[in-house]
Design a protein with these regions (language model features):
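Covalent nucleotidyltransferase core used to form phosphodiester bonds in nucleic acids
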Residues: 7-9, 45-58
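Catalytic cores of nucleic-acid ligases and guanylyltransferases
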Residues: 125
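Extreme N-terminal tail/first-helix region
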Residues: 1-18
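A generic structural micro-feature
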Residues: 11, 27-29, 60, 109
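Short secondary-structure boundary/capping segments
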Residues: 8-9, 36, 107-109
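Short, P/G- and charge-enriched loop/turn segments at secondary-structure junctions
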Residues: 5-7, 23-24, 104-106
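Short beta-strand segments
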Residues: 14-49, 78
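Short, structured beta-strand-loop surface elements
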Residues: 51-122
Length: 125
């Protein structure tokens, strides 16, 4: 289940997302890490500046769940690694949102692209 359009817009506009995947025990959250985020086709995406060496990325891939804190709200989430052609469109979203930043180039590099994650609220049955 994706974020609502309102929640997604609020998260992306605030640009203050902190990500905290679960630690190896599966119940304790890791230290919240501030990262960039973009929206594409109703989904929220993040990338590891240090690629797959980013600690939060490694935990997100292992645990597949955690929380984000953004726009004054804490949300339980799931994490899904992303690869393939969608990364080109995610690059474009980063270029649009962060065009003036000196950190843009590393965030659209192959290293960062290899650590792209889709962040979603957990599905409810």
């Amino acid at each position: 289940m994706p974020f609502s359009e309102t929640d997604l817009d609020r998260i992306v506009t605030a640009d203050d997302l902190h990500i905290a995947p679960f630690r190896d025990d599966g119940t304790t959250y890791g230290t919240p890490t501030w990262i960039w985020c973009v929206a594409l086709d109703g989904s929220l995406y993040v990338r590891g500046y240090h690629g797959q060496n980013s600690r939060w990325y490694q935990a997100a891939v292992r645990q597949r769940a955690g929380k984000i804190v953004a726009a004054g709200t804490t949300t339980e989430v799931t994490f899904e690694p992303v690869d393939g052609a969608v990364n080109d469109r995610i690059d474009d979203a980063y270029r649009t949102k962060y065009a003036e930043s000196q950190y843009l180039k590393p965030m659209i590099s192959d290293r960062a692209r290899s650590a792209t994650i889709r962040v979603s609220p957990p599905t409810t049955d």
